[in-house]
A protein has these predicted regions:
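Adenine nucleotide-associated cytosolic modules
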Residues: 1-334
Length: 334
């Protein structure tokens, strides 16, 4: 092993014997009281020197060679150390290098830090609905390294669908599904496979019928939409494990007996021109993509048993908790 301090973390010296690794308080580490030998060792933890070489560096600097072992142990325990032999060399043509570096900072297990994007590459995600929200979600997921991103949308692109990072004006009149398939990379080894997760980003209605079918088939799914001046991401439904959209409706009906009639009319009579602020749509799309990626990367997103909601004009998100409803039955077998 040739130890390497994580190259994505800043290294700043607070004084000659104190070094801070990382600027974000969630994972920053401060080492203090370092002597000349330890300082020399730290400056040489660069993925080139192995442990015997680091011990020799400590000795030449007038320190105890065992200081190298202690320093490596501390850094490894803090989760800021990589094995330089297993880190891919920096490639300026690697478009996913910033994403790989970011995710590796969130992952504790050293094995996962070595190739953090592997789970994304294996995944297949389908986005249903390719308006202002769904089109951006699809492109973000593809750009973040998801192996296969497919789009299902039977409509044609209109000027109102155009948004930065999604569909463009040159797509006007082209089927939305076709316009996006032209810009989404296709993984040959994943053609025809069922999706690991489906994102429901309806351009009209509430997508409840799709959600029911996906729940029945055991397919994880996430809802992302704008309702007038509010954006809602969630729930992320893990069939048999977390609350579903019907659970949410039952909780609402407990408080508002007319809620089922409201939902039925919202599904059956979508507005001709739905309000969808472009900045709100972008925020919803980004949040939805983040939660999909978090799920694929092995985290538990806040949209499991919950929704993340944001509203104009300020876009400050808040989480609402939605536990499984006892009358729903979607988790009874769990």
């Amino acid at each position: 092993m040739r130890p390497l301090v994580h190259p994505a973390l800043a290294r700043v010296w607070r004084d000659p014997g104190t070094v801070q690794i990382g600027l974000n308080p969630s994972h920053a580490v401060v080492l203090t009281g370092l002597g000349p030998g330890e300082v020399a060792v730290f400056r040489s933890i660069d993925g080139v020197h192995d442990l015997p070489a680091l011990r020799a560096i400590a000795h030449r600097a007038g320190g105890d060679p065992i200081a190298a072992d202690r320093l490596i142990e501390i850094l490894d325990g803090a989760g800021v150390l990589l094995d330089g032999d297993r880190v891919r060399p920096d490639d300026p043509d690697d478009a996913l290098a910033p994403d790989r570096a970011s995710l590796s900072l969130l992952t504790i297990a050293p094995a996962a830090r070595e190739e953090p994007l592997a789970a994304r590459r294996r995944a297949a995600v389908e986005v249903r609905g390719a308006g202002r929200i769904g089109a951006v979600i699809a492109r973000l997921l593809a750009a973040a390294g998801v192996g296969r991103v497919s789009v299902a949308d039977g409509g044609r692109t209109m000027a109102r669908d155009v948004t930065p990072g999604g569909l463009s004006l040159r797509d006007a009149g082209v089927p939305r599904e076709l316009a996006l398939s032209a810009v989404l990379p296709e993984a040959a080894d994943q053609r025809g496979r069922d999706p690991d997760l489906v994102v429901l980003a309806p351009t009209a209605g509430t997508a409840r019928h799709d959600a029911v079918a996906l729940l029945r088939d055991g397919v994880p799914h996430l809802i992302a939409r704008v309702i007038e001046t509010s954006g809602v991401v969630g729930p992320l439904v893990l069939p048999g494990q977390s609350s579903c959209l019907r659970c949410h409706d039952l909780h609402r009906a407990d408080r508002d007996p007319a809620w089922p009639r409201v939902v039925a009319q919202a599904d059956g009579q979508p507005n001709g021109l739905a309000a969808c602020d472009v900045t709100l749509a972008a925020q919803v799309a980004a949040l939805a993509a983040q939660h999909v990626l978090a799920h694929l990367d092995g985290f538990i997103p806040a949209t499991v048993d919950g929704t993340v909601e944001t509203s104009l004009p300020f876009g400050l998100p808040r989480r609402r908790s939605w536990q499984p409803h006892p009358a729903c039955g979607c988790t009874w077998a769990a």
